[in-house]
Amino acid sequence: MNRAILSQRITSILADLNRLTNALYAMNTTDIQRYPDNYEVLSTDAALRAENIACRLRHLIYSTTSIKKEEYLTSAAVMQGIKVDENDGVLEITLPCLLPKRKQRQSTEYLLDPFTAAMSQYARSRPLPRLQHCVVCFSHVYCQDLPKRQVRDYDNLELKQFLDVAASFILTDDSGLLCDAYNTNELGETDCTRISIT
C-alpha cells in the first residue's frame, strides 16, 4: 500500500479515536438517572465508533501485513469471548454482547466476522451434525443492573445473518419449514446473546 494512503487512513483512525475519547468523557460526566436519553445517544455513538475503528484497523492489517484474515479473526473471536460448545446434542453459541440492530453494517461486521471464524475453528476441531430439521433459540440476555427500558424489540435485531452463518455449518437448509426460530429475553450479570440449536 502506498505510504501516503496508509498515513491518511491512520490519521483518519486517530481522529476517530479522539472523537471516541470525547464521547467517553461525556458519558462519564452525564448523569444517567437525570439524562438517560443523552446517555443513550452518547453510549451508542461511542460503541459504534469503537466498532468502526476496530473494523477499519482489521482492514488495514489485511492490506498491509502478511497476517491471514482467518488467523486474525480467530484471535478476535477469542478476545471478544465468542464461545461455541456442544452439550447433550445442543450446539450452544455465546456472543459477548447483544446482537446489533439492523442496518448497522459496521457493527454487524465487527461481531459477524469473528463469529464465522469461531464456527469454522469449532467445525475443524470436531465433527458437526448436518441437521435437516432444527430449533434455534436466540436468548437475549440483558444486564440486570441497567434500566429495563434497555430491552429491545426482536424485529429490530440482526438475527438472519447470524443464523445464516450457523446454518452454513450445521443445517442442511434454514428454510422456515425446516428451522423453527424462537426469541427470549433474560436478565443476567452482563449483556450477551446465546444461540442454542438442536
Residues of each region from the PLM?
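N-terminal targeting/trafficking signals and adjacent low-complexity tails
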Residues: 1-72, 76-81, 85-89
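Short amphipathic
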Residues: 83-99, 137-142
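Short glycine/proline-enriched loop/turn "hinge" motifs that connect secondary-structure elements
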Residues: 83-87, 127-132, 187
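Long, charged, low-complexity intrinsically disordered regions
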Residues: 87-90, 104-109
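An N-terminal amphipathic alpha-helical segment
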Residues: 107-150
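Short conserved catalytic/interaction loops centered on acidic-Pro-aromatic/His motifs
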Residues: 149, 168-178
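Short, low-complexity, polybasic intrinsically disordered segments
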Residues: 149-166
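C-terminal edge-of-domain segments
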Residues: 175-198
